[in-house]
Amino acid sequence: NLFLKRLQFLKFKLGHERKIKSYQIEQNWYQRHLNLPVNKSFRIPRCYLNISLKEEQIILLEDLDNAGFPSRKTNISIDEINLVLKFLAKFHANYLNEKTNGLWEIGTYWHLDTRQEEWVAMEDSPLKKRAAEIDKILNQSQFKTLVHGDAKLANFCFSKDADKVAAVDFQYVGGGCGMKDVAYFLGSCLNAN
């Protein structure tokens, strides 16, 4: 089995430029990995086909369910959290000081430049007052790498016995501090309790 991602640009309304660009970024990411052997230190789907046509793009990927990663989690154990953190550490180490060519300059879906409406809506607080400073520190990190950019729990696929993990959804991959992925992942594992 294979997994087909097909995006038809005509279906997007005006004002969705960032969303369209995110799919182009993902296509660029998979172009870097087209027909490469499977990376054993961190698992992503193999890309078999990556084409752009006039009004659509098509990416043909390995089906991770058939590759031994059929499980998706909504609740996660400490061991599974550690497994994902090890994945992210290997991912970030592999791409340390990598150029962002064709990817987001500032990776991640959530960064201050893209979340101004949410920032304005926040109640006055120390976090709101220091948001620009925190964002600047993260963006000027000495140890830049490529970040997954949307490292939430839903974007990780687990083996049946939960001793291996793979990542999907690379629409917001780009440059940054690896802690952005770590913080977003850990936050996605929390619930109201």
Task: Please identify what each model-predicted range represents.
Residues 11, 68-69, 156, 175-177:
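Conserved protein kinase catalytic core
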Residues 2-109:
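Conserved ATP-binding subdomain of kinase catalytic cores across diverse folds
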Residues 67-149, 153, 157-161, 166:
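ATP-dependent phospho-/nucleotidyl transfer catalytic cores
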Residues 28, 175, 179-193:
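Active-site activation/catalytic loop segments of kinase-like enzymes and analogous catalytic loops
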Residues 169-173:
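Activation of the activation-loop gatekeeper triad in protein kinase-fold domains
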Residues 3, 60, 146, 167, ...:
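Short hydrophobic-acidic sequence motifs that mark active-site Asp/Glu residues
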